[in-house]
């Protein structure tokens, strides 16, 4: 599911064979002038975009991350194949995922425009931010965490390593916070929710290992929070 494109340079080549979005014109005004549509009887322009779904604001489904070749609820990773996800696809919850959204503007709470890369947001940070906003995290909430990184990159116009590089984000310990608060989903304005570099070199994206296949939480990346931050 793509909620909104925020830049054409936000996807990098990686082991999953992702590529930057490709925009192709299928029909143009010059085609019309050249007489290409004379027999058709209608002059028009048309185009298409091809892109990996991780190149824009997206939900990470429960079939996105595997641990020991298993996904959420113990389903085999083999159930995600060239035909798509037979289990835990995001489309399975499209009619069920509705709830209260809670914006935790951690950057504003900390008194900064944005967090620098590598800054880990801890359980205490989330709790103190919620307290300062006079909001209580409840079971089933959709928690949105703002680091300010998206706006910083939009202002600078330099995406660099935004997709796949170092970033501020949630500390590994927040997996326990997510579990204890029984929230439904967590969203951030960074590319992968958790802090980069990771807090350990023993695992790649360890927060993902726990939150998605073990706790069963969907996550959202690349969330554009400029407007909700202004109207809060």
Label the model's feature ranges.
Residues 1, 50-52, 97, 181:
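Alpha-helical hydrophobic/aromatic positions enriched in membrane-embedded helices and signal peptides
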Residues 1-7, 12, 224, 229-231:
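Single conserved hydrophobic/aromatic residue that forms the stacking wall/gate
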Residues 4, 55-57, 143, 186, ...:
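Short conserved micro-motifs on helix faces and helix-strand junctions that flank
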Residues 8-9, 13-54, 67:
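A long-range scaffold signal marking pre-active-site subdomains of enzyme folds
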Residues 9, 48, 100-103, 141-142, ...:
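Structural motif
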Residues 53-142, 150-152, 165-167, 175:
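Glycine-enriched loop-and-adjacent helix/strand subsegments that border the catalytic/binding cleft
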Residues 145, 149-225:
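Feature captures the catalytic cores and cofactor-binding loops of soluble hydro-lyases/lyases
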